[in-house]
């Protein structure tokens, strides 16, 4: 659904700003579905500050990024482009957001926090980052039962 929505916006005159990491499979796939003239990748706050776009714009985010990771960039985009189109509600990955919020709430009360998942999973890596930012500096990604 997400790529369809992004393509629809691009075909209807919008320049798409994709907030994400260039080597992430979701970003690579999304950027491969839309003509290069219609999509631009923003990875950092500076990228957002330096955009020069003179056409209608919409933004989408890599679904595995935390809300905290994207909020500052989104605010800059909204300040710079007051008529920017938000992502469709169904394009937002609530499972990812819910997990990150749960980790945020729990990690601040923990001395040790394990995330069980693949080292190649952006979701797992991001959950460790969220736990650390939320107050549990001893947060660890466990990719194998033998590592516990």
Pin down the residues of each PLM region.
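The feature marks the mature, well-folded catalytic cores of soluble enzymes
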Residues: 1-148
């Amino acid at each position: 659904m997400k790529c369809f929505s992004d393509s629809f916006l691009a075909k209807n005159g919008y320049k798409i700003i994709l907030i994400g990491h260039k080597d992430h499979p979701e970003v690579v796939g999304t950027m491969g579905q839309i003509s290069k003239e219609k999509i631009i990748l923003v990875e950092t706050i500076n990228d957002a500050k330096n955009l020069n776009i003179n056409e209608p714009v919409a933004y989408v985010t890599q679904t595995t990024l935390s809300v905290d990771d994207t909020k500052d960039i989104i605010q800059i985009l909204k300040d710079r482009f007051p008529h920017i189109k938000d992502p469709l509600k169904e394009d937002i990955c609530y499972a990812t957001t819910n997990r990150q919020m749960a980790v945020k709430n729990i990690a601040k009360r923990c001395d040790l926090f394990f995330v069980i998942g693949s080292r190649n999973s952006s979701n797992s890596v991001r959950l460790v980052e969220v736990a650390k930012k939320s107050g549990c500096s001893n947060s660890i990604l466990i990719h194998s039962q033998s590592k516990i």
